[in-house]
């Protein structure tokens, strides 16, 4: 019989040691109701009231007690290196303008591999290398609402 979870907890004290783990890509971590396959081949039915974006280390609280830890899977990414700090801002702007998920550090940006975007970035003077690591992009401005609203076409001042 599968486990069932209807509650997500942020990583906490050691007294919440997980029974098992589930490893998910960035896209797989955005969900509401799904049967998840654990690393030990058990399954857990995640059944939430609304869609969430799970983070690495989050805990799925199991009915009847216990926790399942969420781990971010390693993914095929591009590591983008700018010439300098101002160039990093310019590159981040171009990626944001295309609504791409991005993890931004002080000296690099990570995105999911896309050859068209790679060519654009190299054309803008960036150094782009392949990387394989967990992907933790920034959460968007609309993250807390459970759904995504842009308002495109509704704001006469939107560019």
From Swiss-Prot:
According to the record, the residues making up region (Disordered) are 140-159
| Disulfide cross-links | none
Q: Where in the cell is it found?
A: Cytoplasm
Q: Name one GO cellular component term.
A: cytoplasm
Q: Cite a single GO BP annotation.
A: protein folding
SUPFAM superfamilies in the cross-refs: Urease metallochaperone UreE, C-terminal domain, Urease metallochaperone UreE, N-terminal domain
GO MF terms here are:
nickel cation binding; unfolded protein binding
Give the transmembrane ranges.
none
Cross-referenced InterPro entries: UreE, UreE_C_dom, UreE_N, UreE_N_sf
The UniProt entry, under NCBIfam families, shows: PRK13261.2-6
Known function: Involved in urease metallocenter assembly. Binds nickel. Probably functions as a nickel donor during metallocenter assembly.
The molecule here is called Urease accessory protein UreE
Could you tell me which species this protein originates from?
Sinorhizobium fredii (strain NBRC 101917 / NGR234)
